[in-house]
Amino acid sequence: MAEYNTEQFEKDCKALGVTLSDEQIRQFLKYFEMLVEWNEVMNLTAITEYDEVMKKHFVDSISLCKAYDVTQNKIVIDVGTGAGFPGLALKIAFPNLQVTLLDSLNKRINFLNEVISAL
């Protein structure tokens, strides 16, 4: 895995009241790398630059914690998850959640299954 500066990402998460472990940060970085890799062969997202993915996909997904109490064991379904936002990002940040990712396209489901296996 390449080296990434995660300082801003961690700061943005802390501003939401979320402190990520080293393992969670590693999972987000792996997710980012796989997103960019798979996006080269299938259109998962228009946002592929590191800083933008961290802010516009990951932090924005985690920000759901401000509107919805995710500290308790909850069941969440992400309908039309696409590349896994917000569902998979929420699952990484809040492992206590039971998250179901739902999408109509098999290529996206295949991508998500690969990411989940890698994490």
Where are these regions (language model features)?
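Class I SAM-dependent transferase core
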Residues: M1-Y4, Q8-N73, I77, E114-L119
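Conserved SAM/SAH cofactor-binding pocket of Class I
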Residues: I62-L119
